[in-house]
Amino acid sequence: MEIVHAIGGGQGDPLVIAGKAYTSRLLVGTGKYKDLAETRAAVEMAGAEIVTVAIRRTNIGQDPGQPSLLDVIPPDRYTILPNTAGCYTVEDAVRTCRLARELLGGHRLVKLEVLGDPTTLFPDVTATLEAAEILVRDGFDVMVYTNDDPIIAKRLEEIGCVAVMPLAAPIGSGLGIRNPYNILTIVENAKVPVLVDAGVGTASDAAVAMELGCDGVLMNTAIAEAKNPVLMASAMKKAIEAGREAFLAGRMPRRRFASASSPLAGLFFD
């Protein structure tokens, strides 16, 4: 068990973001659950350490009279990752990050997303680049949602983002990894963590992302909209771990023709 733990994930194979090490490579969102109790149960079952929160849609102290997500996802147990979901302009995204910093007592780690279209929820990459530059200058540690364009991903890294998060497919679509070679190219060229963000639908999608060499996966809808969210959270945890181990192990080469698994020399009755 100790060997598997060291090689396949955990303390011997940490995910490091903005100088902090995490044992889990599964990051989860908090939207779309039926209630806060289900949110807590799913997050716990996933084994996640980083939990993302939509500041514009979730109460984390903005409304003292209402239940707060932080009551069930306490910041002393989890790293809270405020995100700018629902922002379509640079100004809104930057303002939302600054609000999160105020609400969370100087919190620096944020997930930036600037959307360009309400139908696809694809990122507006021009606005994303501009917002990233502003936030990095303002002292934020920026994890950034982007498309699967390797050139844009590299530019965001050069700006100073601490992690690049390309979509695998449209947010909430569950379509899986649509352009694996684009994701692979981003991974191969990156010097910061690459985490697939959006598009995962089931455990096999998460495993594929990790097998490509991604450092982690962030998901919400795939767990929250499952028939049994808590059970799906467990499945995703195992898929992330299995995919990471497979990547570290190194898959066999693909071959066009068969290759016998048993030696031909020394056959009985030969």
Curated annotation (Swiss-Prot):
InterPro entries: Aldolase_TIM, Thiazole_synthase_ThiG, ThiG
Subcellular location: Cytoplasm
SUPFAM superfamilies, alphabetized: ThiG-like
Top EC category: transferase
GO biological process, one term: thiamine diphosphate biosynthetic process
Active site: K111
Reaction it catalyzes: [ThiS sulfur-carrier protein]-C-terminal-Gly-aminoethanethioate + 2-iminoacetate + 1-deoxy-D-xylulose 5-phosphate = [ThiS sulfur-carrier protein]-C-terminal Gly-Gly + 2-[(2R,5Z)-2-carboxy-4-methylthiazol-5(2H)-ylidene]ethyl phosphate + 2 H2O + H(+)
Binding site for 1-deoxy-D-xylulose 5-phosphate: G172, A198, G199, N220, T221
Keyword Cytoplasm tagged: yes
The protein's Enzyme Commission number: 2.8.1.10
Role this protein plays: Catalyzes the rearrangement of 1-deoxy-D-xylulose 5-phosphate (DXP) to produce the thiazole phosphate moiety of thiamine. Sulfur is provided by the thiocarboxylate moiety of the carrier protein ThiS. In vitro, sulfur can be provided by H(2)S.
Name of the featured protein: Thiazole synthase
Organism field: Methylococcus capsulatus (strain ATCC 33009 / NCIMB 11132 / Bath)
Gene symbol of the encoding locus: thiG
